[in-house]
Amino acid sequence: HLPESHLAATKSLERLTFDEALALQLLLARRRHQFESLHTTPRLFRSGGLLEIFDNNLPFELTAGQIEVGNEIESDMKSQRPMHRLLQGEVGSGKTIVALRALLAVVDTGGQGALLAPTEVLAAQHFRSISATLGELATAGMLGGSDRATRVVLLTGSTPAPARKEVLAQIKDGSAGIVIGTHALLSEGVDFADLGLIVVDEQHRFGVEQRDALKLKAQLPPHLLVMTATPIPRTVAMTVFGDLDISTLTELPKGRSPITTHVIHEVEKPHYVERAWERILEEVSKGAQAYVVAPRIESSEKDGDESREHAHSVESLYQFLTQGPLRSLRVGLLHGKLTSEEKDRIMRSFAQGDIDCLVATTVIEVGVDVPNATVMVIADADRFGISQLHQLRGRVGRGAKPGLCLLLTTVDEQSAAMERLQAVARSVDGFELARVDLDQRREGDVLGASQSGSRSHLRLLRVLRDESMIEDARIDATTIL
């Protein structure tokens, strides 16, 4: 192709870019079309059911957003067409309650709901918090249990064989109304009596293939609710999750506290680092708890950056803190190499207040909920992406006390990495940060095959720049199909 003028070249490029946008939107529209042609069991709201009892006993008011999204879900599930909805919301915006209400609505109609979590730590936490939130509504089959209740079960890769056998039987005979688990739910031998709803937590950890694998466990196509706390700019949502309807929770529940974030340069301001450890001592003396996060487990781990040999590891930080500035505190250590039982035990101790400060890797990034934690120090913060830092900091300020997040770094003041950290310190708006993140990264990373089920590298199309083109392509794709 040899264009005769700059204008002709520009027009040709525009045309090729549009072709790429259209091909992608056709793929998503086809998925959507296939989904819409399916039929499923409508799940109608039942008066006097578990959901109504649950709502009447809630110790707090639902936010306007939670009620609105709840209505959208209720309307979806009444239909004979399976719900296919993405629920995105800021860290701590109360997505789990919305999902739990949907699960109860399905149990009320005689169906079962499955909650798929990305890690065992998160699955175990969901199991504990949902069981506690439901109270006697989760006591079906137990001695002295309520006759107006369901059974909540947990299934992960490390569920011991005898317990696993019992849980599988309860899933198969339908006595387990709410099934919480990890990838283990996708394995052979897990058979549901009537799987009516799948809730996938933290979407970016699961590919399309895994969503589809769980759907095959149902006799009729189940309703699907996908939750993510990583806010997604609208065009990315249209591009990556174009086959899903989108609901957004923007307001935080009452009682949530603000989070302040500061960047600390370790080399230029070493006394500020000492002050960070003092701040943890002060918070603990007031009865609060703290996190210290590092990017790697051992100092010996290489990450391809030879100039950063001194990078912090959780093991070296744990030794330094327990022998130095935090030696008077009860300090715990949590990372991915521990067994599931150890991870669960440590998280439980921290949640119960038996550990003052938890030194951890990003195991704690998603969903960990300890309202008493008020301060987080992130070592080598430049090693984390914007959305990861936003997720991590969302672990503090979850209760009535304000949260503080301190980002430690040694990078150059003028570097792109420092720009990222300053952006996180400036804003607590996840949607704004998601756009900054997208500006800084190649879009191929955002549209990974693991996320979209489509090819991972866009050649010409740029998600933010070509926003209006993507919208046009979406309209055309819908018309073509």
Annotate each predicted stretch with a short phrase.
Residues H1-N57:
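Upstream accessory/linker segments immediately N-terminal to the RecA-like ATPase cores of bacterial MutS
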Residues H84, V98-F127, L137-T150:
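Conserved SF1/SF2 helicase motif Ia
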Residues D147-A149, L155-V179, S187-L195, S340-C357:
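Conserved motor-coupling elements within RecA-like helicase/translocase cores
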Residues E268-Q289, E309, S313-L481:
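C-terminal helicase module of SF1/SF2 nucleic-acid helicases/translocases
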